[in-house]
From Swiss-Prot:
Native species: Danio rerio
Protein localization: Nucleus outer membrane
Transmembrane parts of this sequence: 165-185
Keyword Nucleus: yes
Keywords of the record: Developmental protein, Membrane, Nucleus, Transmembrane, Transmembrane helix
Protein name: Transmembrane protein 53
Amino acid sequence: MGDDDLDYNIVFSEALISEKHWRGSKEPVVILLGWAGSRDKHLAKYSSIYNEQGCTTLRYTAPLKTVFISESLGYKELRSTAHKLLELLYDYEVENNPIFFHVFSNGGFMLYRYMVELLHSHKQFSTLCVVGTVVDSAPGSQNVVGALRALKTTLGPKVNVLLQYFLLALFAVAVFLLRIVLYPLTKYFHRNHYDAMMEHPAPWPQMYLYSRADRVIRYRDVEKMVKGLQEKGLMVESFDFITPAHVSLFRDCPEDYSNRCRTFLSHCMTTSEEILMKKHH
């Protein structure tokens, strides 16, 4: 079952563990959206944080060309991917479960942006119950240098050096022109993920985890987003791990990271249940 075009992995909860943690309530379905170039074995480590809590997890990472080329050049290819991922919830008959997102870097955040837009506007998806989101090492705004570092890391040492520099130069010119120089014009038909999520944010609780040592995503961009959302009256919290590199928070601080994610999920579930109870009274 599911969409053959998507390279995703789903792990269903174990009944005994779910019952222990959620005591008769439907267990959360956690959607993990990987950073550009992340492999499923990387995401599986994060997935286990939630599987151990009796959650069902759905893991997906958008292809590199979609993140770095299509999105940078204004093609909304990720929007159709977002639609397919949300449809999977219906394919696997978990559309009535609480939904929780765990999003990594700009690669995951760009895809998350379209999922949020669909949850706002699409008749079918608007009935889904999203309880919260964890954002790891994102979002970054118009950071060409950071994007180049991310692309260089993703290409890796196997790519010919001359080809690597050519691709980096081409990417830099395209992004600089379309997303910075011409952005006052291009934003009218393709707003960047940062501005889109600042202007039309997700209404549910959010937690931003980041590091001021991150050389790909500027920590000030994350803090600006957090402050902007808090000023809109949203439930948003954040934590600066200070020393880890980009998307290395869990690797460097596994216990602290896991505890924060689990505690936040429990808090989101409790908050969601309280809101539902108030609606029924």
